[in-house]
Amino acid sequence: MTAKWIKQLRDKRIKDKYGYEIVLVNDGSFDGTNNSLKKIQEKNEHITVITHQQNMGLGQVLRTGITYIEKKANENDVLCIMDADNTHDPCYIHSMLNKMKETGAECIIASRYQKGSKIIGVSWFRNLMSYGARLLYTVSLGIPNVKDYTCGYRIYKMKKIKKAMALYGDQFISETGFTCMVEILYKLYVVGTTFNEIPFELRYDLKKGASKMKVLKNAIKSIDIAIHARRRYRY
């Protein structure tokens, strides 16, 4: 997947128009992953690898990556966050940047629930759970123009990330599991972020290895977040 990123990011449209840096957060994988990432980093000045010494979960991965980037980025930069397990194709970055420019939205989500989206390789049960969570968040949080509250493939304007981090400090991301994606979204909404979405194709069939998501535990946590987010995250 990293090789695919590099190939696409060397595309003249991005390199000449935007410039880029790739930050890879390795969450405690020492099965050869870290050595491979270091070799890639040595060959490309645009790549930074940060390694956790043990598996710490999605929330900490995002804290590590976003904190590192926030210190280097200026308010005019944009931040794209995506999974590196083959499920999120980098080809959508262009569409997301174009959508941001066209609409003026400050966060663009690659959505599983826009017309034209596809979900491939996900069991009917997980699809059902995801759809249920979507309805729950829509009713309880009601963020304008958002249909997909949990997909991690997003582009953010750094000025809003910086504003939220200034407000919440170390608690900008307090959730440890997959519900941190909802937390980030709502806290950005609190600081006035505007949102929009593009359709995309989630390729779960290309994911290597089993999912680390504990479905029942995540479902319970999703309900908790939906009920308490407005009180818990308001400022």
Each model region followed by its residue ranges:
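Non-catalytic, C-terminal membrane-associated alpha-helical segments of glycosyltransferases
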Residues: A210-D224
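Structured catalytic core of nucleotide-sugar glycosyltransferases
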Residues: M1-W124, L128-Y131, Y156-Y168, E175-I198, ...
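Short aromatic/basic micro-patch
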Residues: R154-I155, K214
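An anion-binding catalytic pocket shared by soluble metabolic enzymes
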Residues: Y149-T150
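Active-site donor/metal-binding and catalytic loop motifs
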Residues: P199-M213
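Hanks-type protein kinase catalytic core
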Residues: I143
